[in-house]
Amino acid sequence: MNAAENQDARSFQPAANGGSLAGAALVIGAAGGLGAALVANLSSVAGGPSPYPAVLALSRSSLPAIDYGDEASLKAAADWVAAQCASRQMELRLLIVASGFLHGPQGQPERSFTQLDAGYLQHVFQVNAIGPALVMKHFLPLLPKQGRCVAAFVSARVGSIGDNALGGWYGYRASKAALNQLVKTASVELTRRNRQSVCVALHPGTVDTALSQPFAKTGLKVRPAEGAASDLLAVIQCLTPGDTGCLLDYKGLKLPF
């Protein structure tokens, strides 16, 4: 990933070595701050044609809509994506899952094990791990069996067990650790199916979105969603099959699981 480390954070371009085959890109979680920025960046690449001439977006408010609590909605959405690709005579070459949950009416991240709550844990795992697992079930089969393709799941550095020195945020940390394991396991199966496939978990940094807003008020440094999206797409462009199954940050550096 040295190339990604040296690449300008705002320079998402078609790979010079033809690393991407033209095809469709799909962003799931497109209504969120980061997801919307990813769609916008993919849809308007400065300086040249996009390697993804068709950009599809799905969210809870899209048509069709997806609901991680309703697996039938995921199957219906996958069928829609397959039909969209077929009508354009394109293959799905890029899948990005940018959905995530940290806080809301269901609860807040825990500071202590005395604050652990079953309802919050169930919801954070539903959105951050179970939902993406069902995305794998219904959308990974749409990726081609030949040629480069990428499945990227937005994770978080706090999901790293080896990097956990602060504690707290039990549910969020554990759900992202579960996502990382799901990504690793799926990467093994995808490689058997297509040796040029790449399946990774990506840490975007702390992005200025609704997810981070309550914590930005405490002085936590946040990054604009547009910049975070450009950084992630620059990393994606430099990925090789040797990176599959890894957790990487927005600079392309590998993080411990």
Indicate where each model-derived feature is located.
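Non-catalytic terminal and boundary segments that flank Rossmann-like NAD(P)-dependent oxidoreductase
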Residues: 1-26, 40
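Rossmann-fold scaffold of SDR-type NAD(P)-dependent oxidoreductases
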Residues: 28-29, 90-107, 128, 153, ...
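N-terminal Rossmann NAD(P)H-binding glycine-rich loop of SDR-like oxidoreductase domains
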Residues: 28-44
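Rossmann-fold cofactor-recognition segment
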Residues: 58-80
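Catalytic loop of short-chain dehydrogenase/reductase
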Residues: 101-105, 109-124, 130, 144-193
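Conserved internal alpha-helix within the Rossmann fold of NAD(P)-dependent oxidoreductases
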Residues: 131-136
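Short beta-loop-alpha junction of Rossmann-like oxidoreductase domains
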Residues: 162-163, 194, 203-215
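C-terminal helical subdomain
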Residues: 201, 209, 217-257
